Regions:
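Glycine-rich phosphate-binding loops of nucleotide-dependent enzymes
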Residues: 2-191
Length: 191
């Protein structure tokens, strides 16, 4: 059985400067791993290499045995890998509900059409409501995401990442700025 994620001799350079040197890593399906290191150690860059936001200078990235290095992020996501970002990445002008619904729609393969009321899709509505409850933002459902506290935005981004339906998830500092109780809820959702 192939690993969920595998990096083989991955390197990333910017000009003459080597940022990532010879990373080899294998993570089995269902395992949880953490990349730990000081600021500037290359943790986020490694996530960018895995998720397609950067291409490796050399080496290969595999998702369940299939080469994904060099693919654009949306194709990697369609193959079952989702990620959150170190800097919160939500649709600031959309409501909490709309942010989550977009991720759920993406995961179900539904496409938005202006003539189709997506709120009439029970599968999408129910899954969105469940994730909203899981991240403890039901009371903030109709609030514009840009008006949420930083911790609430982090929770929303975790919800979006999970809602995408991927079976491999990369979380970049997912609980930064959260209280102890918020962190416990986030960890429970991630498990």
């Amino acid at each position: 059985m192939s690993a969920a994620i595998e990096l083989r001799d991955v390197e990333k350079s910017f000009g003459e400067v080597a940022i990532i040197r010879n990373i080899s890593l294998s993570v089995a399906q269902g395992e949880r791993h953490a990349l730990i290191g000081p600021n500037g150690a290359g943790k986020s860059t490694t996530f960018n290499l895995i998720s397609g936001y950067m291409a490796p200078t050399s080496g290969v990235v595999l998702l369940r045995g299939q080469r994904i290095s060099g693919l654009p992020p949306y194709q990697i996501n369609r193959r079952g890998l989702s990620r959150s970002f170190q800097v919160t990445n939500v649709f600031a002008n959309m409501s909490v509900w709309e942010n989550l619904r977009c991720a759920v729609l993406w995961s179900t393969g539904q496409r938005y059409a202006f003539w189709k009321n997506i709120d009439n899709l029970p599968e999408v509505r129910e899954r969105t409501a469940q994730i909203l409850a899981d991240i403890n933002l039901t009371a903030r459902r109709d609030v514009t995401a840009g008006l949420l506290t930083y911790a609430e935005q982090r929770a929303l981004e975790i919800g979006i990442t999970v809602a995408g339906g991927a079976d491999v998830i990369l979380l970049d500092e997912p609980t930064a700025g959260m209280s102890h109780a918020e962190t416990e809820r986030a960890v429970a959702l991630i498990r």
